[in-house]
């Protein structure tokens, strides 16, 4: 049996931060982008929104409610907004890449020009717990408000700034190619090879004695960019 979840995806129970409002008055997470990984939300409960930015269509906001689903490509800057008890199942392609550097938080051009300052802000949750996560979120939102202002006042400047940010992230990720390739080879690519082997083997049986995995509920949530995370990553055979 392959390790991890089907097709090498990641599943995470996400409760978007609602402990206190951000500088713009909203309960929300950090705006951030992924370099190579697609992401999706399936809403379990509550209501909110996801704000999306890309170079083709600019800014838009999609409402979220129980049963709704949204999927977006890498390079899409996104922020989750919690209006009332928003809890989602976050689905990530290429499980493990986000933890290995695939994501970058929006802190504005001044921080992007200072790698050490970026690392300091990134580490706040590890150093200060929940308060550090909220402090990091607040710093992100303060900068993100300027991007929203550009969208309203100067679309050309907005696209220039968004393009700059995505470019910074892509250049930062380039040295991590081998690390990313290893994750994909051991995850999605291995699942693809297994599926093709099963097809080649038909009509022989593909049953396996270790074909059932179980992930128990529990454990302390992790402090993520969007909120409190409970990833499904501890599996046992049953």
Residue ranges and their predicted role:
Residues 35-50, 54, 91-93:
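Short, conserved beta-strand element in jelly-roll/cupin
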Residues 13-35:
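Conserved short histidine dyad/triad with adjacent acidic residue
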Residues 124-205:
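An accessory alpha-helical subdomain
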Residues 31-34, 38-43, 61-62, 70, ...:
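His/acidic/aromatic-lined binding-pocket segments of jelly-roll/cupin-type domains
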Residues 49, 68-79, 86:
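Histidine-centered metal-chelating micro-motifs
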Residues 179-238:
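C-terminal non-catalytic accessory extensions
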Residues 85-152:
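Double-stranded beta-helix
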Residues 54-75:
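Short acidic-glycine-tyrosine-enriched beta hairpin
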């Amino acid at each position: 049996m392959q390790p991890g979840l089907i097709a090498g995806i990641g599943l995470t129970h996400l409760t978007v931060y609602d402990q206190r409002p951000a500088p713009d008055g909203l309960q929300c997470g950090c705006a951030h982008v992924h370099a190579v990984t697609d992401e999706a939300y399936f809403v379990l409960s509550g209501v909110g929104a996801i704000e999306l930015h890309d170079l083709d269509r600019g800014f838009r906001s999609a409402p979220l409610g129980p049963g709704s689903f949204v999927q977006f490509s890498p390079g899409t800057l996104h922020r989750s907004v919690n209006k009332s008890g928003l809890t989602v199942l976050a689905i990530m392609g290429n499980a493990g890449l986000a933890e290995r550097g695939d994501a970058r938080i929006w802190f504005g051009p001044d921080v992007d020009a200072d790698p050490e300052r970026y690392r300091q802000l990134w580490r706040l949750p590890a150093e200060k717990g929940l308060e550090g996560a909220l402090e990091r979120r607040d710093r992100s939102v303060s900068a993100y408000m300027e991007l929203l202002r550009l969208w309203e006042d100067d679309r050309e400047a907005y696209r220039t700034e968004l393009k700059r940010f995505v470019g910074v992230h892509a250049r930062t990720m380039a040295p991590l190619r081998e690390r990313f390739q290893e994750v994909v080879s051991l995850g999605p690519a291995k699942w693809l090879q297994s599926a093709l082997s099963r097809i080649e083997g038909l009509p022989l049986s593909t049953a396996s004695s270790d074909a059932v995995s179980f992930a128990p509920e529990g454990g302390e949530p992790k402090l993520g960019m969007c909120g409190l995370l409970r990833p499904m990553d501890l599996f046992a055979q049953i």
